[in-house]
Structures are given as structure tokens and as C-alpha cells.
């Protein structure tokens, strides 16, 4: 049997709309992500389990892990009968790369089980294709960090899909999921079709400056440049309590705060555990809206998807 874990990810990381993503894992060692296991069988089957199993589609063929199996078999040119199990630990529509977790774990588990017939670039291409079926357009800002780990910058040139960006080991990423759902398609539809020239210039300056600061080890500058002029000004109306949470993060001393992916999860960067814990407590008391919500203090997951056991 092969079992693969794929970690949560932050799409956009505020400053890089659709071109930047970061994988994260809780500091307490718990798994914030999905697991998919594959074992030999006479016929294909898919079993679902985990905390968020009730959110999955009733029709197995609509399950993204079934589609992983189907696409993988098409790609290698033969049908591989396997029993697959999806452990759905990630809420759907959370802004934590939930679909990416299932896609990455599903395709990587099949590839490992079959003796790695596909290389990482081909596998990542298929992951982007499947992710596109869900969100409506191919983008890699969740699947790339989820699969490869760390902070990834999407390039999509010269046969290169993404490359890693140097990161800051002492940063703590406080992740708060309020327990409500925001559809990626809805969150994209709310964005303007055209942007003001000044916003385009600011976006270019922030993103270029952030990447430069990461490569030159300037943590304070990198954090200061984590600003979103593309999505956040429009998406905050979908996120009750976000403005108050951002203010609380600033008051507590967080270095940066933003929307993870299309929301509703909020992320905040702190450089000491005391501030991170204070902010986590505040978010738990004030940002969560129901029992499905959670807060985790994380670090970057520099490994990405991996086999367990």
C-alpha cells in the first residue's frame, strides 16, 4: 500500500495573485491536509473518510480523486485496478488549497504505486489540469507548493512551471478558518475585469520587491511588501470580521496579514511564538463562526507532499 499526505497551502500569499503560493503545516505536528492511500485490487474502488467527508459529492465520479485515477490511467495508457481511500481533513471552499490537497495526494499516490512512470513536471501539469476543472481555470499557486513544498513562484516558461523562493525560517504563519465556505468561482467573479494603472504599478512593485527581499534575506522588507491590491480590496465583503481581524493582528504585532487564496481563511505572519499565540487566541474567540472553524500556528512546509509510513 502507498499512502501520501499533501499539506495545506496559501494561494497568492497576498502579494502574488495567481503566481505565488506557500505550503504550511502546524507546529504541533498535526496533519493539516489530505491523505490518499492506494492498494492493489481486482476492481477500482474509492472510499472516503475524515473530518470533512460529509462535504464531498455523493456521485463518486464527481470526486476529484476518482478523476485523478481516471486521468492518470489515460496518461500512462492502461487501466490500473486499485482500491483508493481519501482521508478528507481539509474543509472545501476554505482558501487552504483543499482541492489541491486531494489532487496532489491522489496523483502522487498513483504515481508512487505504479513505480513513478511520470516525472514531477508532467505530474504537476496534470495536477494543474485537474485543479482547473474545479476552479474554472488552470492555475498552479496551490498545487505547486502543495506538491513541491515551501514558497513557489509560478513561471510557466521554458518548460518550467514553478521555482522555489527563499523563505524565512523564523516566520510563524497563523491560519484561521472561520468555518464558512467561499466558492473560488464566486470570489473570482467579484474581481474587476480591468484595473487602474496605479494599482498595476503598485502590484508590480510589491511583488518584485517581495521576491527581491526573499532572495536577499530582508525579512522585515519582505513582510512590509506583502500587500494585495488585486483581490483583497474586493473580496473582504465576502469575509465577515476580516477587517477587525486584520486590525487585531496589527495591534498584536503581526508582520503581515491577508486572505489565504480566495478565503475565508485568514493568514498572518508573526516572528515570535508569544505574538502568534496571542493572535491565535484572539482569532479563536473572534473570527471563528462555528464548530467547524479552527486556528493553527504553522511553519512553512518545505517538504511538500510525501509518503507516510
From Swiss-Prot:
Pathway: Amino-acid biosynthesis; L-threonine biosynthesis; L-threonine from L-aspartate: step 4/5. InterPro entries: GHMP_kinase_C_dom (IPR013750), GHMP_kinase_C_sf (IPR036554), GHMP_kinase_N_dom (IPR006204), GHMP_knse_ATP-bd_CS (IPR006203), Homoserine_kinase (IPR000870), Ribosomal_Su5_D2-typ_SF (IPR020568), Ribsml_uS5_D2-typ_fold_subgr (IPR014721). GO terms for biological process: threonine biosynthetic process. GO terms for cellular component: cytoplasm. It is found in: Cytoplasm. Keywords: Amino-acid biosynthesis, ATP-binding, Cytoplasm, Kinase, Nucleotide-binding, Threonine biosynthesis, Transferase. Gene3D superfamilies: 3.30.230.10, GHMP kinase, C-terminal domain. Its EC number is 2.7.1.39. It catalyses: L-homoserine + ATP = O-phospho-L-homoserine + ADP + H(+). HAMAP family: Homoser_kinase. Belongs to the GHMP kinase family. Homoserine kinase subfamily. This is Homoserine kinase.
Amino acid at each position: 500500500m502507498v499512502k501520501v499526505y499533501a499539506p495545506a497551502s496559501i494561494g497568492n500569499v497576498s502579494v502574488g495573485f495567481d503566481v505565488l503560493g506557500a505550503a504550511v503545516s502546524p507546529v504541533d505536528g498535526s496533519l493539516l491536509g489530505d491523505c490518499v492511500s492506494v492498494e492493489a485490487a481486482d476492481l477500482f474502488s474509492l472510499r472516503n473518510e475524515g473530518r470533512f467527508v460529509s462535504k464531498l459529492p455523493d456521485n463518486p465520479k464527481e470526486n476529484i480523486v476518482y478523476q485523478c485515477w481516471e486521468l492518470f490511467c489515460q496518461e500512462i495508457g492502461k487501466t490500473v485496478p486499485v482500491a483508493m481511500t481519501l482521508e478528507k481533513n481539509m474543509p472545501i471552499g476554505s482558501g487552504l488549497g483543499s482541492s489541491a490537497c486531494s489532487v496532489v495526494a491522489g496523483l502522487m499516490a498513483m504515481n508512487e504505486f505504479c513505480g513513478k512512470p511520470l516525472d514531477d513536471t508532467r505530474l504537476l501539469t496534470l495536477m494543474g489540469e485537474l485543479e482547473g476543472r474545479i476552479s474554472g481555470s488552470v492555475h498552479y499557486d496551490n498545487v505547486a507548493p502543495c506538491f513541491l513544498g515551501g514558497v513557489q513562484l509560478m513561471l510557466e516558461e521554458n518548460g518550467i512551471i514553478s521555482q522555489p523562493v527563499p523563505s524565512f525560517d523564523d516566520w510563524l504563519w497563523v491560519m484561521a478558518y472561520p468555518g464558512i465556505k467561499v466558492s473560488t468561482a464566486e470570489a473570482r467573479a467579484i474581481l474587476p475585469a480591468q484595473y487602474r494603472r496605479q494599482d498595476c504599478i503598485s502590484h508590480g512593485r510589491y511583488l518584485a520587491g517581495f521576491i527581491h527581499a526573499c532572495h536577499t534575506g530582508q525579512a522585515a522588507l519582505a513582510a512590509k511588501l506583502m500587500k494585495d491590491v488585486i483581490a483583497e480590496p474586493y473580496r473582504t465583503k465576502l469575509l465577515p470580521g476580516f477587517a477587525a481581524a486584520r486590525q487585531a493582528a496589527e495591534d498584536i504585532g503581526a508582520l503581515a496579514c491577508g486572505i489565504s487564496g480566495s478565503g475565508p481563511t485568514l493568514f498572518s505572519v508573526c516572528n515570535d511564538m508569544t505574538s502568534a499565540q496571542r493572535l491565535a487566541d484572539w482569532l479563536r474567540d473572534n473570527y471563528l463562526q462555528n464548530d467547524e472553524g479552527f486556528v493553527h500556528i504553522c511553519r512553512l512546509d518545505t517538504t511538500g507532499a510525501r509518503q507516510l509510513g
